[in-house]
Regions:
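Conserved Radical SAM active-site core
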Residues: 2-12, 27, 38-143
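Residue-level signal for inorganic ion chemistry
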Residues: 31
Length: 143
């Protein structure tokens, strides 16, 4: 009997330069998980967002105060989220860091030898579900 890999919800995978803290300036691949136990809804800001009017999470407006990524935790946005296995998520992360000078999407850049980081964020990634997804992604990246 073949083991079926569990799928996890995520809102986005992208590559950018770390902009905060000790690792400011380090190229980083990001995976933003979906759902959060905190539900910090806008700190008094009105939420006019109706998810039915959007087809992609990228089209949602960014709030100007409070949690600027409510789409990553509010259940009403679940239909806009991706849902994949850790193996597929690992492939998407590698694809996000591929460039002309790093065509294989390596975390150690083949030319500059600069390390790239992987950051798990959004939706309380260290809760049990996020931990399982993160470990599955690490295992898939090791292959």
């Amino acid at each position: 009997m073949e083991k079926v890999e569990k799928k996890y919800y995520y809102s986005e995978i992208f590559h950018s330069i770390q902009g905060e803290g000790e690792y400011t300036g380090i190229p980083t691949a990001w995976i933003r998980f979906f759902l959060c136990n905190l539900q910090c809804n806008g700190f008094g800001q009105k939420d006019p967002t109706n998810p039915d009017t959007y087809e992609r999470v990228e089209d949602l407006p960014v709030w100007d105060k409070g949690c600027d990524s409510s789409y990553t935790w509010a259940k009403k946005f679940k239909g806009l989220m991706g849902q994949e296995t850790p193996s597929v998520l690992a492939d998407k992360i590698v694809d996000a860091i591929k460039t002309d000078s790093n065509p294989d999407g390596l975390f150690l850049h083949p030319g500059s030898k600069q390390h790239q980081h992987l950051c798990f964020t959004g939706g309380e990634p260290l809760m049990v579900t996020g931990q399982a997804a993160s470990m599955g992604i690490y295992r898939a990246l090791e292959k």
